[in-house]
Swiss-Prot record:
Keywords: Magnesium, Manganese, Menaquinone biosynthesis, Metal-binding, Thiamine pyrophosphate, Transferase. Binds 1 thiamine pyrophosphate per subunit. Its cofactor is Mg(2+); Mn(2+); thiamine diphosphate. HAMAP family: MenD (MF_01659). The gene is menD. It comes from Citrobacter koseri (strain ATCC BAA-895 / CDC 4225-83 / SGSC4696). This is 2-succinyl-5-enolpyruvyl-6-hydroxy-3-cyclohexene-1-carboxylate synthase. Coiled coil: none annotated. Its EC number is 2.2.1.9.
Amino acid sequence: MSVSAFNRRWAAVILEALTRHGVRHVCIAPGSRSTPLTLAAAENSAFIHHTHFDERGLGHLALGLAKVSKQPVAVIVTSGTAVANLYPALIEAGLTGEKLILLTADRPPELIDCGANQAIRQAGMFASHPSQTLSLPRPTQDISARWLVSTLDNVLATLHAGAVHINCPFAEPLYGDMDDTGLAWQQSLGDWWQDDKPWLREARRLESDKQRDWFFWRQKRGVVVAGRMSAEEGKKVALWAQTLGWPLIGDVLSQTGQPLPCADLWLGNAKAVTELQQAQIVVQLGSSLTGKRLLQWQAACEPEEYWIIDNIEGRLDPAHHRGRRLVAKIADWLELHPAEKRHPWCVDIPRLAEQAWQAVAARRDMFGEAQLAHRIRDYLPEQGQLFVGNSLVVRLIDALSQLPAGYPVYSNRGASGIDGLISTAAGVQRASAKSTLAIVGDLSALYDLNALALLRQVSAPFVLIVVNNNGGQIFSLLPTPQSERERFYLMPQNVHFEHAAAMFNLKYHRPQSWDELDAALAGAWRTPTTTVIELVVNDTDGAQTLQQLLAQVSHL
């Protein structure tokens, strides 16, 4: 009997089972213990293969692929700390709903807790963060192929959102020629190999029912809060709110067109807050809200009813409002709850939103990161997409810009970490094959610098704007101790990215004016390659501009 041959047949069943649950993208890191899984993936023509040498970046690459494809993405890594490096992407997927299937190779049980090399306790290492975990036994013909495939189907059928961790131990030898070992075991699945459906099919209903009193609530004074959603959902939500005559507060990830722009500015105005107090119902569609003033208002508001609609299960309201938590796809929910044409009930808020926008526009000529956020609409590629980093940049875009309705916007706003942002953006581009503009800060770029290797393979123009404000300037907005702010919070690195781009053979520009940025972008959008554009800005201007605008708008 050939152990290596049967390992590969066992792995072939695992990978084939994944195809029956919509998996098309497989992300693979190099490793020896994962050889059976890697070879099985390589031999399966249903897969598109992606490789990366860094498992942390690989997990985020898969996250980006899943964001766009809306299908589960598989990740294959070897044993040991390679597995632990998937933790950040797994956590993010659990909070934002992308579906990942983590296939982690492992040593067999007899090599755990005995000092064997590269052997750690992998089973259950991710605690409660995966939606499901499955620890497979060592491959053996004593266990039927039917057990293996039906066990996988049972776990994968429950993957509504988040990650599944499937731990796969393999004994040595891992290499060798294929022979007939396990052929009959594999063939016991019969014509399943020629089929395209799961061995075990399970139906699971998640959609919420129509709220029978909706006809009553839609006649009341309401507010619509739009969080993270798809581009198509964003357009539908905007039309729905407009028909109802309800003010729409749109997050940067809502893709609603933000008809009341600069919400995180005007929500700091007492007149706006007073008018919003008249709302009898708040309907929040989508989660992961960004703006500080929006979150403060959301926590303090006390409507008669607060409804949250999102396809992700679980609690999504840190303010714990009295109301309804409805699990549904946003587009489906809107169809079940049609709007009734009514006149807008808000008077002050549209005026304040326009005045806030004009206050921001009056500062647009200065070369800085706040102005970049305001101008970002002008730099979006036609028929393309935007990926927004975390920390200060996403807050500035949320507060100071107005993105087009239905324009795709992606970000990692679940755990909101600065790790893996470039890798995630690379996955977004690969899955969509669209022109992509990605914006991150300098520390975020340093954190994921080796992801520039992924940007050597793009299928459409990709522009990475690194806003270099020399450190974590988000902390300038917080009451951090002034005496220790630079040393322990901002941590300026005093670096530039020209040599990093050159190391990966990527085009690079460092514009010092809006005209130079326009020229760099015009050239970048003409070729299907990656261009790194570094905007070196004054350290504190972005944070200070936001604070000045908040003060100005609060007194309108």
